[in-house]
Regions:
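Catalytic cores of DNA base-excision repair glycosylases
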Residues: 3-196, 200-214
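Short, intrinsically disordered, charge-balanced linker/junction segments flanking boundaries
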Residues: 217-222
């Protein structure tokens, strides 16, 4: 069984039951992605529910007072995320009649949405075959393929994105993207991963070459 199919099979057995995974509605998916930037799932979950309860739709978020949004955000830090969230909701409500762009190309034009978030929403909501590349993906791919490129370099991001696009299941892009991120979050963790219990322990090059703890490689800033 190849990497992609094995990964998806693992995910279907081991995945966490997270509320934003049970929908293709772009609004809660977008909310979850913004909340979870720089934030752990356990910490972000109550905020996700609070925002959905207070603002069930993007239009209701748009008409909210900014101070109300910031108050609900209190404790998460990085308040520019909350301001961008509110401004983007207003743009979608007022300029797009409350309808999210339905493609990566359209989503990435929105304020506060970068390459990763656009890819996540496009694949999870619309099943568009675009790869997500975050810290988890860097780690899984660099270890499995034994890639020692410096992940702080811009060209490395392109290298990993191209490789992730090759691995991506064109039939099930949302499932694959969720699977590779979940694998990095639960199994292929940054420190002391339990490689003896890993589905890839006979094919992972980092394990074979005793480089699990040094990959992915990131140069120290001088």
């Amino acid at each position: 069984m190849n990497f992609t199919n094995l990964l998806i099979e693992w995910y279907l057995q081991k995945k966490r039951d997270l509320p934003w995974r049970n929908t293709t509605n772009p609004y809660p998916i977008w909310l979850s992605e913004i909340i979870l930037q720089q934030t752990r799932v356990a910490q972000g979950m109550p905020y996700f529910y609070a925002f959905l309860e207070s603002f069930p739709t993007v239009k209701e978020l748009a008409i909210a007072d900014e101070q109300q949004v910031l108050k609900l955000w209190q404790g998460l830090g990085y308040y520019s995320r909350a301001r961008n969230l509110h401004q983007t909701a207003q743009y979608i409500a007022n300029e797009l009649d409350g309808v999210f762009p339905n493609s990566y190309a359209g989503l990435i034009q929105l304020k506060g949405i970068g390459e990763y978030t656009a890819a996540a929403i496009a694949s999870f909501a619309y099943n568009e075959p675009v790869p997500v590349v975050d810290g988890n993906v860097f780690r899984v791919v660099s270890r499995y393929f034994g890639i020692e490129s410096d992940i702080s370099a811009g060209k490395t991001k392109k290298e990993f994105t191209a490789l992730a696009a090759e691995l991506l299941s064109k039939e099930q892009p949302a499932l694959f993207n969720q699977a590779i991120m979940e694998f990095g979050a639960l199994q292929c963790v940054p420190k002391n991963p339990r490689c003896e219990n890993c589905i890839f322990n006979t094919s992972c090059l980092a394990l074979k070459n005793n480089k699990v703890n040094v990959l992915p490689f990131k140069s120290k800033k001088t």
